[in-house]
Amino acid sequence: MESGSGGGGGGGVAALASFIMNEEELKRKQREKLKKLQATGGNPRPPRSLFFFTLKNPFRKTCINIVEWKPFEIIILLTIFANCVALAVFLPMPEEDTNNTNLTLESLEYIFLVIFTLECFLKIVAYGLLFHEGAYLRNCWNILDFVIVFMGLFTLVVDTINTIAGVPTEKGGGFDMKALRAFRVLRPLRLVSGVPSLQVVMSSILKSMLPLFHIALLVFFMVHIYAIMGLELFKCKMHKTCYYQGTNIIAVREGNEKPSPCAQAGHGRRCTINGTECRAGWPGPNFGITHFDNSCFAMLTVFQCITTESWTDVLYWINDAMGNDWPWIYFLTLILVGSFFILNLVLGALSGEFTKEREESRSRGEYQKLRERQQMDEDLEGYMEWITHAEVMDGDSEALLLLRKDTDSESDSLYQMLDQQVIYFYRLARRWNVVLRRKCHVWVKSKFFNWWVLLVVLLNTLVIAMEHHNQTEGLTSFQDTANVILLACFTIEMVMKMYAFGPRAYFMSIFNRFDCFVVTIGILEIILVVSNIMTPLGISVMRCIRLLRLFKLTRYWTSLNNLVASLLNSVKSIASLLLLLFLFIVIFALLGMQVFGGKFNFPDRVIQRSNFDNFPQALISVFQVLTGEEWDSIMYNGIMAHGGPQSPGILVSIYFIILYVCGNFVLLNVFLAIAVDNLAEAESLTAAQKEKAEEKARRKLMRTLPEKSEEEKALMAKRLMESRSKAEGMPTTAKLKIDEFESNVNEVKDPFPPADFPGDHEEVEPEIPISPRPRPMADLQLKETVVPIAEASSFFIFGPQHKFRKLCHRIVNHTTFTNIILLFILLSSISLAAEDPIDPRSFRNKVLAYADIVFTTVFTIEIVLKMTVYGAFLHTGSFCRNSFNILDLIVVGVSLLSMGMESSTISVVKILRVLRVLRPLRAINRAKGLKHVVQCMFVAIKTIGNIVLVTMLLDFMFACIGVQLFKGKLYYCTDPLQKTAEECQGTFLKHVPNSLHDIEVHQRMWVNSDFNFDNVLNGMLALFTISTFEGWPEILYKAIDSNAVDTGPLYNNRVGISIFFIIYIIIIAFFMMNIFVGFVIVTFQKQGEQEYKDCELDKNQRQCVQYALKARPLKCYIPKNPHQYRVWYFVTSCYFEYLMFFLIMLNTLCLGIQHCNQSDHITKLSDTLNLIFTVLFTGEMIVKLIAFKAKGYFGDPWNVFDFIIVVGSIVDVVLSEVDAALEARGGLWCLHGCAEVNPMQAIAEAENVRVSITFFRLFRVLRLIKLLNRSEGIRNLLWTFIKSFQALPHVGLLIVMLFFIYAVIGMQMFGKVALVDGTEINRNNNFQTFPQAVLLLFRVATGEQWPKVILASMYGKLCDAKSDYGPGEEYTCGSSIAVFYFLSFYILCAFLIINLFVAIIMDNVDYLTRDWSILGPHHLDEFKKIWAEYDPEATGRIKHLDVVTLLRRIQPPLGFGKFCPHRSACKRLISMNMPLNSDGTVTFNATLFALVRTALKIKTEGNFEQANEELRAIIKSIWKRTSMKLLDQVIPPIGEDEVTVGKFYATFLIQEHFRKFMQRQEEYYGYRPTKKNADEIKAGLRSIEEEAAPELHRAISGDLIAEDDMERALEAGEEGIYRRTGGLFGLHTDPFSSEPSSPLSTQMTSQRPLQFVETRLEDIESPPDSVFLPNTEFFPDNMPTTTNTNNNANFVEDMSSRFTFENESLSAAATRNYSYEDIRGSSSYVGGASSVDDRRLSDFTVRTNITQFPYNPSYGPSKNQTATEASPATDKLIQQALRDGGLDSLAEDPKFVSVTRKELAEAINIGMEDMEGMAQGIVNRQSGKVTKRKRRPIPVPPGTKSTKPKENTSAV
């Protein structure tokens, strides 16, 4: 037995082992198979390759084996890597020189080429070349390989030919060999095809190119428009500069000042240096590259400006050339639209696409893992079951018993052998060990220990931060000692934790591993220092690792800990992106070396630091372009290296543009996507932990209250939840949801009068609410609650009932008083801006001083009044208890103090004057919307705390490392030849270029760099400027040149040190700064959703519902006059649109041909073409005016825009012609012969007239903007643009206030600094006037050279000659506060406000990357446009029959699309279920709302009436001001027996169903059965239950399957189903009968005239037999039709009397088919109604008090049957069948049951009375049984999926 069981067990184990081996083998084979498939692109190998090699060919077999051999792949990757190294080592030299290394590398190139060619050949033989799936060239990466190999071979062939022909190799015999060899740099791209993770990133980038197409188009379009505007405005303006008279030497004041344009007259820069003149002949700024002389250069300049790099230089040059009156408008709008909006669109689209792609790949990975786990579980489960059955378990249990006995005997013998005392001590030691570990564990977990560790960390930080340049020896030794002590503390902490938790548990935590690493490195550092093994540099870097201990702080701060953890996790996701970024940089660096290597050597200029002379330098240069800092200057050098702007060298700008666009716009924005992803993850982590902590607290509470009753416990839990919601409520007021900043969040977009939406008249609390959703601004401004007089007395004099106090109360709370105070605040703000900062004694300042007294008096009176009313500060509710009132008090107090002190030189008075700038802040307390925004911003700043802290920690760490590396090493002597401070004394001679005086004497000075690392604070400031990408190359090159402490720089001394800066930029600038943007976006989205978290609608649903509720129909003017109609028809046709589009494009090309110094022929041609286009566009305007008349024409904003452009263009043409005619007399403004008086004046006047004429020439350019209206994609982007600005009113106001305050402070503090050319405070950039100050701040906000502005504003700068400085105080202007001033402004602007703008754009641009099949607000405008064609007068109603055709003209997801069958359309209408008016019309809002509701599945499930009520409640809660009338229109309330489209079209489906039922009967019997028995009724009832009900059910719930419907419709067409007469539309005359009226004419009256042609086309598209059409009823020609549609009662009676004729007309009607359009277009559509406008559908009756009948009157009671009579038994059976089908609500509708009864009777060919008798018999037989039987399963046709209808479903 034992052996048997043992054998069984062994057999089971062996079987399990063999099974696992088989499984492993199977998996291995599957992997190999998958790899082979991947190698061939997922396709099987072709049977033949190159038409010759079959699969069995031994040579091909060998090729396949080699290619699919893993080492082969590794060899190729290594070869690519080696090739990259060879390319990097290559040293390009000027003038095509070379050296031995380069020659060796050239010969190595042949080896690489042979290897790559061989690989290519083997793969082509293995997989075939091109003509079948899986061929070599069918894979994109292989195409890249093939091109690279081909170009290499081609280069080799050309080289060989040249060598044979004796042509020098490099000249290439006509071929540019350098260009061909440049293809070699693409070889690193082959690494992408070898690394799968790179392929994923690359593929997702390529995939995201699609949504970027429209944005790229918009960017190009915007650049083109601004370029042509620049061409018109600034052409030929930048070629004059100041020359010394009689020479070609350009005059500049300082050696470092760049030459600038000048103006001979007018407002431009004058030449002020003695002996200089302003004349033409200068190539222009940047070697003649930056100008607007032709469209290409203008586009390059505009592109450079929208990258915000050197845009102010271009603006200042234009100002110098033309004056600074208006060019700033051009550049500011360019930056706002181009840089802040359009480039952020790129960011939004990219990040959305990447997030989507990452989400998809994550989902795919999770799904794959789940499948594998399920498969493994299934295999294991099956096999374990098999083993369990095979094994005999008893044997195992016996074996275990034997084993236990053996163990016991062994332990007994052990006890006997060992001494008892040893055992005792061993046990005692173990016990003590357990006790000590437990105590140690408690100690380590205690708060005291945590605080001790934190204290040690902070001390460690302080010791490191104390280090600085020129520190004392004592401090150094103290730091060394402290380091050892602190290291010992950290070592003790580590050992204690390791002992308390055990090594395994200790190393489970990532933070503990991190601690261990830091401590180990610290110990290693001390050992190396003591033993003098390592260099000091290495030691200093290792010391900095101690700084990582700072992150120990985060473990005690949960949310910060989670943030750090998520950032560490994101390193994995960043790795592949960084690899791609590195590959991208390497490729462009290698390409740059090929194109620019050794060419950046210009004889007349200093050495260019950013160059491509070697690989490390090329990498740095490419990285610099990638960050966007001074990328334009590198581009200019590249252009000059290839011959300058006049040669084809200008084409190298393409290299830099592609590098900038791909690197900066695309790759760097992916960091943002990753940042947003990981932030969301950190947020969810924190939320989950919060939830966990609350749960723990709740459990603890319950445990502490065991004796309390259940009710008390519930009450306590409720209180806990309330306290939680309050705690959470306050932070969530950080509503970065910008809708909150609108004048009203939900009503702002309503363009209609508010009469339709009466507001709820409740009083609104104006203070910030505690609830998660702040009140909308309009609500806050509707009515302010008046604060009553407090019970306490004020000033101990005025009691609560005192008359004076009551009077003051009335005054203070009066609206007029508030408005007056706001007006005075505005006036005082204007007076502050109008002050002259230079001369305090100027007349203007004296006048403003008196005004200041008036303002101060008014504000003082206001405060006194308020204190009188509310009391000063002693009691609750008093004036000083409000923080905003304290602000008011401070501002007024400051004004009073500054009035009392006279001298402006006293620093206290200066400060007090500066503090007056806070006056505008007083407006915040009065404008409630603005107050709310400010409060939200403060809370938002609190929420960013964690990110700021992490960034500051990192910045601090890098600053400490910087101090270790660079302290005292960035000093230099002004004489570059001297290297130490001792040598740097005395004077030296300096040659001045471009000067008449060749040599100048300068004083030697030993100076420090402006941004240095001498201490931690300086280091943090330097690093912060680097993180903003401003001026970092300058700091980098100073660091590279740094030598030793207190020693001057050596050129390229430490190139490797650049790694420090690059790592810092990647970690901080690329990643952490994007985290800021990401955090604002995440907070914005989270808070936006938070406010609606309980309303059950997501954001998209809310936007669409809001649109549907607020939209109003558009008026569509259609002329009555036939001639005018023809013009209108032509103007509204698409051909006219295409013609105008073509003309605008032609006009664009014609505008682009202009250039500076163009010939007279070009000028004449340009003017002639302009005249022609002006005539054409004037013609367009006239034609449109004829078509639409003035009212209709000017109703469209685009037409108004056209009109302005045409008028401006006509003025332009007239002025140009007049000016040309008067040219001989000096032009337009010199009619009185000013040329004779003063030639310079003539030039000035001529320039002025050019400006005037040029202004009107702008109208030519503005025509291009009309193109924006032509493209759907660009229209959508414009929609985003408008939406973004719509969301910014109060935020915009906040930005204006911020700029105003900072501008006025800047004027007071830096206004006296002298304007010195060559510095950053100069004639174009200063604080001397308010507009200049605002422009300077705007420059700082864009980040343009802002660190240099700080340096130019620091204390010790030269004062302006007009200012009131004393003797010897010439250099006392500026202020040390400049650092704080500019830093705070830059941080507020760049990181908060501009990011807020980015967040809004990203929120509005999400539709670009969203699934296009999801309905969004941008789809809904189309509905309004097409509705207008059916309802030109904008009545808001159309016939319900028009709805089908209207919706078929709108493409999905909003409409049905033109290919949607009518039957499917009718079923969609059932689910839409709009209320139907008595005249057969539906309303605009109800239809749009129903479309939105069904498309987005808003409350369409479950009981329909209940869903309606829930939706009504949601709408009331979100859109409180929606009128009840509108709400009843879109969602009828319960209890109203409304006629709805759903009920109406439900009868269609019942009728269609019975027609099919009859057809089946005919097919079954071959004829209409005459046998009448109960089985027939049962069959009909069964068909209702099993066929009609499920179909209706699906239609009601909107669960339609389009393909299924299409198939059924086609089947119906093939079976030849004919439309039977009778029905729902009442009496219709045959449209093809011999009636004199034409269907065409009637259509023209009932429908938009444009549609009378299109209707027939739709009929052709949808074959009549395949489409479900309404049934029509025909009568003999001699039957008179009813014309009095106004008397519907008679009409019903008349119809009832004719009911008997129906069967007679059956056979005749069944032989004809009529289209839906024929019916709705026929003149007899409503029973012969003569007036279409007054007609009523015959399907409706006038409502009476007795009854209303919603359906066709012919289904109503006949003459012999009163309205109250019925067929109870039949009705009962039909109701039962409907209920069994899940249509309870239809079963309750007597009218619907009546319709169904009649249809059933007709279908089984039986009279009503007979059917009732049989039905009664069925009911009698069923009596005593359960009435509601179990539903039978619905038979499903083969090959289709069964859709089981839900129980208890909704009503229609």
UniProtKB/Swiss-Prot annotation:
A Gene Ontology biological process term: release of sequestered calcium ion into cytosol
Repeat (II) residue spans along the chain: 433-679
Spans annotated as Disordered: 1820-1852
III repeats by residue range: 802-1084
Region of interest: Dihydropyridine binding: 1004-1093, 1358-1424
Region Binding to the beta subunit, residue ranges: 374-391
The organism's taxonomic lineage, starting at the top: Eukaryota, Metazoa, Chordata, Craniata, Vertebrata
UniProt source species: Cyprinus carpio (Common carp)
Side Cytoplasmic, residues: 1-70, 128-139, 196-214, 352-447, 502-509, 558-576, 676-815, 871-882, 928-946, 1082-1134, 1189-1196, 1272-1290, 1403-1852
Tissue-specificity statement: Skeletal muscle.
Name this protein carries in UniProt: Dihydropyridine-sensitive L-type skeletal muscle calcium channel subunit alpha-1
Highest taxon above the source species: Eukaryota
Homology family: Belongs to the calcium channel alpha-1 subunit (TC 1.A.1.11) family.
